């Protein structure tokens, strides 16, 4: 009887020994049945801004000990475009306000890439009327981001100046 009871318990416990061993590890949850989930770079960022006018660092021109200024900005990522909003006070210049919507972008599981070239957007940056030619950059899933804004001030005049803004930042 004891032997039969042992066999019965073994027979009942046998299904517990067979476990489904599928590949159910999500990793970083970016691939779902072959569908890649893009990162979400929307949010607020803190970083440093460098402004170059005709290739010279604007901050160093004003003060040789300063090469950049702290800056905060917001990225709003949509399906194929991204909006950039800077509204912050920066060293020497004071208030920097820039709102650009509809910057072409692509996203994958690793990063958001801004690839706005040949934009021709007229804005006022740091007191100069400029034409923004391009906004490019990348924001990674770790929250690190880099932006490059290329513009021309006083375009079409003998005093035309090239304005380049470089920002490196981290998501808050």
Task: State where each predicted segment sits.
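Bacterial Sec-dependent N-terminal signal peptides
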Residues: 2-4, 14-48, 156-172
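Transition segment at domain starts
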Residues: 40, 44-65
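Edge beta-strand at a domain terminus
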Residues: 98-111, 144-172
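Hydrophobic lipid-interacting interfaces of membrane-associated proteins
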Residues: 50-54, 89-94, 119, 154-156
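Predominantly extracellular/secreted and cell-surface proteins with exposed
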Residues: 63-135, 139
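A short hydrophobic beta-strand element
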Residues: 45, 86, 113-115, 143-150
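Surface-exposed or flexible loop/turn and strand-edge residues in extracellular/cell-surface modules
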Residues: 42, 46, 68-70, 100, ...
